[in-house]
């Protein structure tokens, strides 16, 4: 059993080294973007804005208002609070 395990591990290592040495580099032309027209064809990534992350996610830990206030201070406001709909409202 021990011989079989040593043989199996050695075989897997040898197989991975051989497959790495046989790998071909990617074509440079495949990912090359040339010019303004090519940039227009690339679709922008869509990112969702979750306004309730500070108040909703941290409400179970009991730090929801202080996390919202810290978030607002980092944005340059005077502080903030979580309203009834669990949205962080920053003071000006």
Curated annotation (Swiss-Prot):
The record's SUPFAM superfamilies line, in alphabetical order, gives:
Scorpion toxin-like
**Name of the protein:** Defensin Lucifensin
List cystine links: 55-82, 68-88, 72-90
Taxonomy of origin reads: Eukaryota, Metazoa, Ecdysozoa, Arthropoda, Hexapoda
Q: Give GO terms for biological process.
A: defense response to fungus; defense response to Gram-positive bacterium; humoral immune response; innate immune response; killing of cells of another organism
Gene Ontology molecular function, alphabetical: lipid binding
Whether Heme counts among this entry's keywords is: no
| Functional summary from the UniProt entry | Shows strong antibacterial activity against numerous Gram-positive bacteria. It selectively inhibits peptidoglycan biosynthesis through complex formation with the cell wall precursor lipid II (1:1 molar ratio) thus inhibiting cell wall synthesis. Shows antibacterial activity against the Gram-positive bacteria M.luteus, E.fecalis (MIC=32 mg/L), S.aureus (MIC=16 mg/L), S.carnosus (MIC=2 mg/L), S.pneumoniae (MIC=2 mg/L) and S.pyogenes (MIC=2 mg/L) and against a number of methicillin-resistant S.aureus and glycopeptide-intermediate S.aureus isolates.
- Name the residues of the propeptide: 24-52
**What other facts are recorded?**
During maggot debridement therapy which involves the controlled application of cultured sterile larvae to an infected chronic non-healing wound, one of the key factors which protects larvae against the infectious wound environment and contributes to wound healing through its antimicrobial activity.
Q: Which compartment or compartments is the protein found in?
A: Secreted; Host cell membrane
Q: Name one Pfam family in it.
A: Defensin_2
Q: What is its main location?
A: secreted
* Post-translational modification note: The disulfide bonds are essential for antimicrobial activity.
Q: Which family does it belong to?
A: Belongs to the invertebrate defensin family. Type 1 subfamily.
Tissues with expression: Larval fat body, hemolymph and salivary glands (at protein level). Expressed in the salivary glands of all larval stages.
